[in-house]
Amino acid sequence: MRHYEIVLLVHPDQSDQVVGMVERYISQIKEADGQIHRLEDWGRRQLAYPINKIHKAHYILMNVECGQTTLDELEELFRYNDAIIRNIIIRREHAITEESLLAKSAEEKRARKAQREEAQQIQDSAEA
């Protein structure tokens, strides 16, 4: 089996259904004895250029290991799912399991925000 990196852009109106879609794709990969090495939900992000008058999309990243028939089935599902605006499948030499830069930066941003809120609470309690 080969390793692939899959990025999906989901229509922003369908963001609440992303979890169900991803679960369906994961179950299909696992049924075919494939593996999920990394799954990241990058959330709603601005597109570089509008696609069908849409300016934002919900991004999903998956690193999977599966056979060609499973990959063909996934491609067909992506093609006929109206909620998926764009997809890209890239073949990789090995499994990538570490967090992507986007996930790391989002995590760092959350940590900085938590520190600021904590500092604000300490300052507010000191003033009171």
UniProtKB/Swiss-Prot annotation:
InterPro entries: Ribosomal_bS6, Ribosomal_bS6_CS, Ribosomal_bS6_sf, Ribosomal_S6_plastid/chlpt, Transl_elong_EF1B/ribsomal_bS6
UniProt xrefs under Gene3D superfamilies: 3.30.70.60
UniProt keyword list: Ribonucleoprotein, Ribosomal protein, RNA-binding, rRNA-binding
Domain of life: Bacteria
GO CC field: cytosolic small ribosomal subunit
GO annotation terms (biological process): translation
Any one GO molecular function term: structural constituent of ribosome
Keyword Ribosomal protein in annotation: yes
Classification via HAMAP family: Ribosomal_bS6
Function of the protein: Binds together with bS18 to 16S ribosomal RNA.
Record-stated family: Belongs to the bacterial ribosomal protein bS6 family.
The protein, known as: Small ribosomal subunit protein bS6
Organism per entry: Acinetobacter baylyi (strain ATCC 33305 / BD413 / ADP1)
